[in-house]
Structures are given as structure tokens and as C-alpha cells.
Amino acid sequence: MKDWLDSVNWNADGLVPAIAQDATSGRILMMAWMNRESLRLTAEKQQAIYWSRSRNQLWHKGETSGHVQHVREIRLDCDEDVIVLQVVQEGGIACHTGRESCFYRVFRNGEWVAVDPVLKDPAEIY
């Protein structure tokens, strides 16, 4: 029997991009990387666990901040090389900047403009 993880088209580093999407609103919250172990653990625990390329270790989202992502559904795209996690974001903050989403800047008139408020000072989170 084929392991379901073998269906994922992992990159040369054994990673796949994973997009966290709010399960209710559909808003994109963040993008991170997953390896086989983090995707397996995410499916098992129903909480988002990513692979930190900078720390070279598993990263259980919310372990430090309390902003855990509860996974409602895991999707694989048609090319099998991108994962979407539909999540319920505990605390309403996904971004390390203290915002709901990491995608808080909009390109307007030739520059990037922050359009989403900081919900909590990152110094109070970390």
C-alpha cells in the first residue's frame, strides 16, 4: 500500500510550501514549509506543525505564542506540490508581527503599504 505522503511532490530539499488559510473566512494567514514528518504530525495531531528552515527543526505553530492553528482540512493542489491547511487560528494572530495575517501589505502606487493593524505588540507575545 502506498504511503499517502508519497503522493506529495517534495522539492529537492524534501520540503513543500504550506499555506495556512482561515477555515471560516478563507483569508490567507501565512505560508511556511513542511517536510514529511511535519505533515504527518499535522495530520495526526490536527494542529499545524511546520519545518523551520532557519532553525532546521520542527516548528509547532503557537508553541511559544499560544497562537495554535487547529487544522480542519488538509488539501493538496493539482500538481501535488503545494499544501493548503484550512485552520482555526487560536488568538486571531498568525503573524509574528502581531497581525492576523502575514499578508498585511498591499502594493499601491509603487510601494508596499501596511493595511492591517497590529493586534498585539510582538514584545508581549514572545
From Swiss-Prot:
Pathway involvement of the protein, from the record: Amino-acid biosynthesis; L-histidine biosynthesis; L-histidine from 5-phospho-alpha-D-ribose 1-diphosphate: step 3/9
Catalytic activity: 1-(5-phospho-beta-D-ribosyl)-5'-AMP + H2O = 1-(5-phospho-beta-D-ribosyl)-5-[(5-phospho-beta-D-ribosylamino)methylideneamino]imidazole-4-carboxamide
InterPro entries for the chain: PRA-CH, PRib_AMP_CycHydrolase_dom, PRib_AMP_CycHydrolase_sf
Cellular localization per UniProt: Cytoplasm
GO biological process assignments: L-histidine biosynthetic process
Top-level enzyme category: hydrolase
Disulphide bonds in the chain: none
Main localization of the protein described in the UniProt heading: cytoplasm
Superkingdom of source: Bacteria
GO molecular function, one term: phosphoribosyl-AMP cyclohydrolase activity
Cofactor(s) for this UniProt protein: Mg(2+); Zn(2+)
Signal peptide: none
Cofactor comment: Binds 1 Mg(2+) ion per subunit. Binds 1 zinc ion per subunit.
Binding residue positions for Zn(2+): C78, C95, C102
Family from the record: Belongs to the PRA-CH family.
Record function comment: Catalyzes the hydrolysis of the adenine ring of phosphoribosyl-AMP.
PANTHER family per record: HISTIDINE BIOSYNTHESIS BIFUNCTIONAL PROTEIN, HISTIDINE BIOSYNTHESIS BIFUNCTIONAL PROTEIN HIS7
Record's protein name: Phosphoribosyl-AMP cyclohydrolase
Source species: Cellvibrio japonicus (strain Ueda107) (Pseudomonas fluorescens subsp. cellulosa)
Organism ancestry: Bacteria, Pseudomonadati, Pseudomonadota, Gammaproteobacteria, Cellvibrionales
